[in-house]
Amino acid sequence: MSKNNDTTLLNEEIRFPEVRCLGDEGTQYGVVSSSEALKIAQDLGLDLVLIAPEAKPPVCKIMDYGKFRYQQEKKQKEAKKKQKQIEIKEIKLSVKIAQNDVNYKVKHAKEFLEEDKHVRFRVFLKGREMSEPQSGVEVLKRVWELVEDIAIMDKEPKPEGRYVNMTVIPKPKKVK
């Protein structure tokens, strides 16, 4: 019996009357009964693995299933390594922020953007500022003017609850 925990059918689990059988090195056994294909696999000391159940007739391959599963897991790990993790850095501002403080925060934002990180600017609205969220949008527009040379606006300044948020992403680097 099989020891697999995924959905791949092996050996006796394959219950189709006829299957197209392929060998490990590309040998073609043609269309044979599944019991005959299983016997060929057992004679070779390998497993019969169903690789295309939707085909007419279904396609089975004679191979070492342990080795096959190891290679599949290895491919998945490689694909996972190549996936790019998007990191979002958050910079908090207030409506009454001084221009020098804005410049300081923008300097940090530019460093993050140069490291290919996304940056979310957040203006916190306190008390009566909640009734006038447009002032927070204006602060973010001032910030945008300072970073637009190296960034692309991913999300426009928009009030969301007690905050006004804007997200910027780095401009794609030009390949020379």
From Swiss-Prot:
GO cellular component: cytosol; membrane
InterPro entries assigned to the protein according to its UniProt record, in alphabetical order: T_IF-3_C_sf, T_IF-3_N_sf, Translation_initiation_fac3_CS, Translation_initiation_fac_3, Translation_initiation_fac_3_C, Translation_initiation_fac_3_N
Biological-process GO terms, alphabetical: ribosome disassembly
Gene3D superfamilies: Translation initiation factor 3 (IF-3), C-terminal domain, Translation initiation factor 3 (IF-3), N-terminal domain
Entry superkingdom: Bacteria
Subcellular location: Cytoplasm
Single GO MF annotation: ribosome binding
Keyword Membrane: no
This protein's UniProt keywords: Cytoplasm, Initiation factor, Protein biosynthesis
Keyword Chaperone found: no
Assembly: Monomer.
Family according to the record: Belongs to the IF-3 family.
Function: IF-3 binds to the 30S ribosomal subunit and shifts the equilibrium between 70S ribosomes and their 50S and 30S subunits in favor of the free subunits, thus enhancing the availability of 30S subunits on which protein synthesis initiation begins.
Name listed for the protein in its UniProt record: Translation initiation factor IF-3
Organism encoding this protein: Wolinella succinogenes (strain ATCC 29543 / DSM 1740 / CCUG 13145 / JCM 31913 / LMG 7466 / NCTC 11488 / FDC 602W)
